[in-house]
């Protein structure tokens, strides 16, 4: 007969100590917690956890071994008005689970009940947790620790980046092993990427409505088990677990000097709204894990049906433990927090929230790169510029400003300069540095750079929502022809703007983030919300990549790393030699010029030596350069071209960089 001893209330989760397994589960309102053990024939053995220390239920299984499958059944009141939705008929996963044995299908027995409990048992179809104890030889691996000033982020999806790469073996494409392949790493190095930011690799599931349409959550933001490595991106090679394969990839990237940042989801869970499945937190302690209204309904500040209550001490601890796990177990270098405003809610946003304070005080986490998506859809959800020191933030105002400047022509010059200078109006306070601004023109959600120049309207019909999903405010410009088919004159204008936007991004102060594929000319055929498209629409087509554009981008990144004003990560001040704003005559911009509205011709002198010359008008122009002799440099002119200039003749929608000849 299998029995449990009391064990220990720490550490959280299921841990093998060499002779047995200690199990712990937090629930402040439960009346009983049953540990459910499953054998190879899926026979279930239920054993009540014998001990409770405060709100931690725990027990120890002598002789238990790694690979043991388990789950929980939690009993307590079913009183939705009070926030309680306990239902012991539902098998629940451990919030600390390191692996699960299956994905989740759209099965009605997973429903916990809306106003009354659902009595159908879910064990036959629910995922089971797997006890994981995997040693790993890191072979002296060390984090690259790239200074923020030198950081160039590349946002990518594991499958999308590697699935069609011709030099990666077919059985490794679309996988963590594909990331580690020399062909992939050499490409990132040649491009000049310092930091690879991966879309979620935490264990996620597909929403029932997507399953009904035969689609999947390709991006992976519907996370069920945040401690578990998603097996969807594992090669399945014998003897190599998803965890090991991800570790191998991180180690290989580190050896190449490339950091790895994970996009993590702690704003909501995969249980969705009240009609979603009961898989974990809802059945463990709904009132503790989620923000609820006074009537017990979910306060949906995420648009995903629920919002995790990260101000609750044990829920906060769950997040902190998870981040430490990824750093300790997988040597992750940093995190990008999806809908990051939720991190500071209590329920209003507070930059001094307990979770922020805990992150700053944690010796392991305080040195990681922390990036917030600084908004959610709740009251007061837009918080750009308001995160604490130690965080950088996705800067959508930079994105919109640069799109307006180059594609719409309606941005005042002062706003352009502010955002070019790391959005100093937003970030130059409380000892924050220019690197706090994560500059971007595009990201995974929205048009790709190619589509930004080819489509004025979104084309999301294949997503199954009648083209209602995705933003309608794209600030794009198709230059007179909707779609990828256009005459040569239109394509010349598109290509000029494409290079101008890339140049602006990579030569602005702040931290640049490049969307994977933008350097290829990758198109999603006008789909600006391709979250459910796990197919050639989102996979990078390496065979048709624009190699000239790729080389142009790589040269820009190399140029960026040479300019002190861009990499020293300190604010530009008047007279410090970092920046001069000049007019088309090479003279300092007057107060009147700053105030006259949408000036579209200017010169930006960086670190005295480099000159960024901008013509964002629809017409060719002649611009007089500052006193001295100036030489156009790669990638704007072949390296053998050294004829000095005093006047620059620029085509419409172009930017050029010159260096002073001494």
From Swiss-Prot:
The keyword Hydrolase applies. It is an enzyme of class 3 (hydrolase). The record marks 445 as: Transition state stabilizer. It comes from the Bacteria. Its EC number is 3.2.1.196. Pfam families: Alpha-amylase, CBM_48, GlgX_C. Belongs to the glycosyl hydrolase 13 family. Removes maltotriose and maltotetraose chains that are attached by 1,6-alpha-linkage to the limit dextrin main chain, generating a debranched limit dextrin. This is Glycogen debranching enzyme.
């Amino acid at each position: 007969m299998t029995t449990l001893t009391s064990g220990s209330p720490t550490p959280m989760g299921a841990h093998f100590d060499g002779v047995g397994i200690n199990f712990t589960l937090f629930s402040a309102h439960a009346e009983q917690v049953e540990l459910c053990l499953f054998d190879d024939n899926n026979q279930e053995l239920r054993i009540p956890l014998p001990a409770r220390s405060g709100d931690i239920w725990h027990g120890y299984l002598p002789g238990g071994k790694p690979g043991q499958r388990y789950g929980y059944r939690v009993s307590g009141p079913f009183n939705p008005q009070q926030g309680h939705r306990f239902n012991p008929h539902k098998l629940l996963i451990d919030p600390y689970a390191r692996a699960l044995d299956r994905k989740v299908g759209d099965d009605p027995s997973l429903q916990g009940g809306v106003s009354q409990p659902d009595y159908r048992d879910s064990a036959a179809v629910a995922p089971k947790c797997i006890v994981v104890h995997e040693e790993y030889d890191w072979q002296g691996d060390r984090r690259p620790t790239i200074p923020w000033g030198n950081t160039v982020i590349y946002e990518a999806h594991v499958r999308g980046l590697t699935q069609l790469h011709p030099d990666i073996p077919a059985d490794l494409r679309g996988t963590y092993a594909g990331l580690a392949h020399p062909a992939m790493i050499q490409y990132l190095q040649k491009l000049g990427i310092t930091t690879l930011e991966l879309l979620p690799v935490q264990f996620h599931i597909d929403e029932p409505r997507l399953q009904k349409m035969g689609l999947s959550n390709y991006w992976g933001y519907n996370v069920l088990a945040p401690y578990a490595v998603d097996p969807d991106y594992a090669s399945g090679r014998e003897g190599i677990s998803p965890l090991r394969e991800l570790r191998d990839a991180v180690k290989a990237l580190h050896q190449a000097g490339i950091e790895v940042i994970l996009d993590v989801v702690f704003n909501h869970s995969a249980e969705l709204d009240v009609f979603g499945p009961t898989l974990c937190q809802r059945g463990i302690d709904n009132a503790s894990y989620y923000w609820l209204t006074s009537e017990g309904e979910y306060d949906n500040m995420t648009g995903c049906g629920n919002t995790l209550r990260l101000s609750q001490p044990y829920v906060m601890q769950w997040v902190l433990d998870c981040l430490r796990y990824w750093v300790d177990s997988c040597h992750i270098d940093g995190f990008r927090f999806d809908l990051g405003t939720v991190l500071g809610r209590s329920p209003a946003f507070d930059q001094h929230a307990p979770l922020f304070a805990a992150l700053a005080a944690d010796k392991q986490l305080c040195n990681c790169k922390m990036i917030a998506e600084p908004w959610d859809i709740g009251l007061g959800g837009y918080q750009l510029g308001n995160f604490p020191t130690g965080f950088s933030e996705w800067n959508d105002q930079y994105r919109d400003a640069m799109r307006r400047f180059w594609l719409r022509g309606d941005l005042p010059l002062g706003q352009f300069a502010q955002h070019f200078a790391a959005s100093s109006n937003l970030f130059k306070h409380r000892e924050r540095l220019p690197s706090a601004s994560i500059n971007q023109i595009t990201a995974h959600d929205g048009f790709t750079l190619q589509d930004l120049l080819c489509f004025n309207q979104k084309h999301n019909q294949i997503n199954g929502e009648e083209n209602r999903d995705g933003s309608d405010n794209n600030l794009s410009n198709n230059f007179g022809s909707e779609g990828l088919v256009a005459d040569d004159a239109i394509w010349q204008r598109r290509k000029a703007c494409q290079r101008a936007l890339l140049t602006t991004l990579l030569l602005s102060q702040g931290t640049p983030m490049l969307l994977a594929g933008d350097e290829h000319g990758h198109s999603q055929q006008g789909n600006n919300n391709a979250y459910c498209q796990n197919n050639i629409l989102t996979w990078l087509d390496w065979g048709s990549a624009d190699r000239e554009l790729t080389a142009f981008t790589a040269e820009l990144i190399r140029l960026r790393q040479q300019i002190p004003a861009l990499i020293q990560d300190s604010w530009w001040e008047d007279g410090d030699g970092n920046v001069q704003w000049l007019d088309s005559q090479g003279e300092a911009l007057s107060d009147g010029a700053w105030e006259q509205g949408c000036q579209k011709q200017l010169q930006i002198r960086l670190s005295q030596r480099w000159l960024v010359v901008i013509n964002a008008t629809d017409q060719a122009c002649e611009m007089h350069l500052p006193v001295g002799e100036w030489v156009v440099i790669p990638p704007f002119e072949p390296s053998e071209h050294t004829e000095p200039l005093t006047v620059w003749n620029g085509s419409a929608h172009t930017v050029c960089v010159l260096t002073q000849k001494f």
